[in-house]
Regions:
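Bacterial N-terminal signal peptides that target proteins for export
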Residues: 1-7
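Bacterial N-terminal signal peptides
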Residues: 8-17
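Carbohydrate-interacting regions of secretory-pathway proteins
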Residues: 19-163
Length: 163
């Protein structure tokens, strides 16, 4: 099965490795967004509204600081290339808070999505791509939050014949 990676998160480094290849292939060049397609709800694929996704000091960052309000504008960043039979290695961290009008569940919430529909296949007002997401959740200071959850927007996962 082929997939596209989308990374709505702050990435410090990111690479994939073919199972048999043994060598890591960087996905992010550390300089710019070449090879990546932004998709933000309510906007066409390829529009990087308010510079949501940016590169600063070699770090890929996601920021909503240019938005007057969140207004349901979920952001996703797609790799232009498709991958299969891969391992993914990355470093990430959360920095800053959320917008006042954003839903509570997006606070310190990010992840990467695989086996996803493409950015151009998403409808204009579609919040999340049909995909499998490996979710990152940070501590909000209210007690432990489970991280590494699997979310399946628009999909079902079958394990041992059960969904």
């Amino acid at each position: 099965m082929r997939c596209r990676l989308l990374l709505p998160l702050v990435i410090l480094s990111c690479a994939v490795c073919g199972v048999s290849a043994g060598e890591w292939t960087p996905l992010f060049n550390g300089k710019n967004l070449d090879g990546w397609i932004p998709k933000i709800t309510k906007h066409e694929a390829g529009v990087n509204l308010h510079d949501t996704f940016r590169v600063e000091d070699g770090i890929l960052k996601v920021s909503y600081e240019g938005y007057p309000e969140f207004d349901g504008q979920f952001g996703h960043l797609y790799s232009e290339k498709s991958y299969s039979h891969y391992l993914l290695r990355m470093e990430y961290r959360f920095d800053g808070g959320m917008m006042p009008d954003a839903p509570h569940y997006v606070n310190l919430n990010s992840g990467f999505m695989v086996h996803a529909q493409s950015a151009t296949e998403m409808k204009l007002n579609q919040n999340f791509p049909v995909s499998v997401e490996f979710q990152f959740l940070a501590d909000e200071g209210k007690g432990h939050r489970q991280t590494g959850n699997v979310c399946t927007p628009g999909t079902l996962i079958e394990i041992d014949g059960e969904t």
